[in-house]
Regions:
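Glycine-rich flexible loops
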Residues: 2-246
Length: 246
């Protein structure tokens, strides 16, 4: 048996995807993970020219295809596409103006929103809940309507350098350097919130040791090669014609 490290050939784990296809698959995989609050939620994906790809308003995350993805500028003007930008897009616009973030994900996932409502960062009880790394904070400065730029500015400022924010009485905001990392972090924070709730309901447990939390916390979300790809392939099996829609 060879002891050499396996290195997948290009395309072995996932076909080459366009940026628009990446946005669609991120939305669909996360919808299946509980990021499914009806029309809520927005994803922005910064492109090399500084514009942002974004999911369209009026279509749910499990519904829109590559042809529906819109391109906007950092002021929210639609540059390409037939749909308007989501109502809450100011949060993303202020974030991208303030920080060099590639991907930002906002939604009201089933379990993370509970902890956001309680204004508590949940304990991390297992390794899967820590995958993707990053710092998690509670932000309670997002106190205006979703389309209010001043409320968005306050939230981004309060977030500081954190990678994941539980927006008090609202939902989550996840930042990452790639689609893969955004998927990993989004899945992990929702799993962390679910497992913490169930563990505490069952009588409590012992969180991960500090050394383990520190180790996982240093991850940029890129280390678990294959995780994102496997979940994306599952979506392509469910909708084999998806890539033909580009």
């Amino acid at each position: 048996m060879s002891t050499e490290t396996f290195r997948a050939a290009p395309g072995a784990l996932l076909p080459d995807l366009s940026p628009r296809e990446e946005v669609v698959l991120l939305a669909r995989t996360l919808f299946r993970e509980g990021f499914d609050d009806h029309l809520a939620g927005h994803i922005t994906y910064r492109q090399p020219d500084g514009t942002l790809l974004c999911n369209p308003w009026y279509l749910t995350w499990d519904e829109f295809g590559p042809e529906d993805v819109i391109r906007i500028d950092v002021d929210g003007r639609v540059l390409e596409g037939d749909w308007p930008a989501p109502l809450g897009i100011p949060l993303h616009l202020e974030l991208h103006k303030a920080r060099e973030t590639t991907v930002a994900v906002h939604n009201h996932p089933r379990w993370a929103t509970i902890w956001a409502d309680m204004q508590r960062v949940p304990p991390c009880y297992d390794q899967s809940s820590a995958l993707g790394g990053g710092t998690v904070v509670v932000v309670d400065e997002y106190d205006g309507p979703a389309n209010d730029p001043s409320a968005a500015q306050r939230a981004v400022k309060a977030m500081g350098d954190a990678d994941i924010a539980l927006l008090a009485n609202h939902g989550v905001f996840v930042l990452a350097g790639s689609i893969r990392a955004a998927h990993q972090r989004s899945v992990a924070i929702e799993q962390r919130c679910r497992h913490a709730w169930l563990t505490e309901v069952a009588g409590g447990g012992r969180p991960l040791p500090e050394a383990a939390r520190a180790l996982f916390g240093r991850s940029n979300g890129e280390g678990f090669i294959g995780f994102w790809e496997a979940m994306a392939r599952a979506e392509l099996r469910r909708d084999p014609a998806l890539l033909a829609r580009s």
